[in-house]
Regions:
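Beta-rich accessory regions
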Residues: 1-169
Length: 169
């Protein structure tokens, strides 16, 4: 849906190797200096999501948002939505050890047969049982998901017809 350029642009990252159980994993996470250029999407710097209730967070900066929270429950569903009916859903299922990203209703998805508007899954075999950090970076045409400080990362292009205004967890 862009005239001259359509490719995922990501933030600068620090790459590190860490030993988890018997595996050596590549972690990647935004550089600390990136924080100077980011405003939080809501007043609290880090939220804790509890299993007993949904939380709807307005996105103060629309599609220029950083969302960060601690996930203490094994499974969670997250939805970005706008008034136009566009939506993106992310499901974290630690029981099945998989993250599912669904962008089928994310806005413009039929502009090219090479653009897969469907559902992507990422296996998370070494995810810890306790609380984990979730950070998402949302911009005009992409959503980046960082799980457990970069242990698992997923980047997807999205082209909503208008900015996402809220996140439901």
């Amino acid at each position: 849906p862009t005239d001259k350029w359509r490719s995922a642009m990501t933030v600068p990252r620090e790459l590190t190797l860490r030993k988890v159980n018997d595996d050596v994993l590549l972690y990647n996470y935004p550089l600390k200096s990136f924080e100077r250029h980011v405003a939080m999407a809501y007043p609290e710097s880090v939220l804790e999501i509890l299993p007993t209730r949904k939380r709807i967070m307005p996105l103060k900066y629309g599609n220029q948002s950083k969302i960060q929270f601690t996930l203490s429950v094994p499974n969670a569903q997250m939805y970005f939505r706008n008034k136009n009916g566009d939506s993106v859903s992310i499901d974290v299922d630690r029981d099945k050890k998989v993250v599912t990203f669904d962008r089928r209703k994310s806005g413009k998805v039929d502009f090219s047969e090479k653009f897969a508007p469907g559902v992507q899954q990422m296996k998370i075999p070494n995810i810890p049982d306790g609380p984990i950090e979730i950070m998402m970076l949302l911009d005009h045409s992409s959503l980046e998901l960082f799980i457990n400080e970069g242990q698992y990362v997923m980047t997807n292009q999205i082209f909503p017809n208008e900015f996402f205004r809220a996140l439901t967890i």
